[in-house]
Amino acid sequence: FVVHTEDLDLLECLVKEPVKTGLEIECVAAFERFARPTVDFLKELNIKPEQEHESFVFQLKKEDFQGIECGDARPGTIADISVIADLGQVEASRVTPEREFLLFQEDQLVAKANIHGLSDHFFQIGGVITHEDHRRKGYGQKVVSKLCQHYFDQGQQEGLLFVLHDNVPAQKLYKKLGFLQTDNFLIANYAKN
């Protein structure tokens, strides 16, 4: 079940009883203002996460977009599935090529980004990866710019993405495109019994 509350009394009611009955906690994932009280409360019950990932939430409004020349960045196709899977280190069956935007240099996939969510108003970017041999060359910025331009042209008004706190190079490139840091997000993963 999902708990979104900053009210500690309500949190205790919603979490303590299910935990006492043996409910296994797998993950707490939410904006930090909701997730942190839950994670801290679970720690008081001696349920500690294996790992915590804190991310900044970056938001881009269409009117703030500072697009750049994207070179040959393009949407993915079925023919690209294997190279997308290789760069993303995922199984090919998990790749949805039409949600991917790709940048190739000399027939090598050097950067990619994809859509994690889409509504009439918003798009959420994820899976931004630049090949380790091609980092700090602007390829990630180009592929994200192409993706943003595509969805703004489709009528969406805002883009959203999550960036780990320690990924300073990515934060800089998103800010150059017009993204603003607007919130914090926390994911806490727990061991399965």
Where are these regions (language model features)?
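Conserved beta-strand-loop-alpha-helix junction that forms the acyl-donor binding cleft
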Residues: 29-35, 161-171, 187-193
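A conserved beta-strand-loop-helix scaffold within acyl/acetyltransferase catalytic domains
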Residues: 92-129
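Acyl-donor-binding surface of acyltransferase catalytic domains
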Residues: 2-70, 188
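Helix-loop element at the rim of GNAT/NAT acetyltransferase active sites that forms part
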Residues: 86-92
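A short beta-loop-alpha structural element at the N-terminal edge
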Residues: 31, 72-84
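Conserved acetyl-CoA-binding loop-helix of GNAT-fold acetyltransferases
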Residues: 8-17, 130-132, 136-153, 171-176
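Conserved active-site tyrosine of GNAT-family acetyltransferases
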Residues: 38, 42, 174, 179
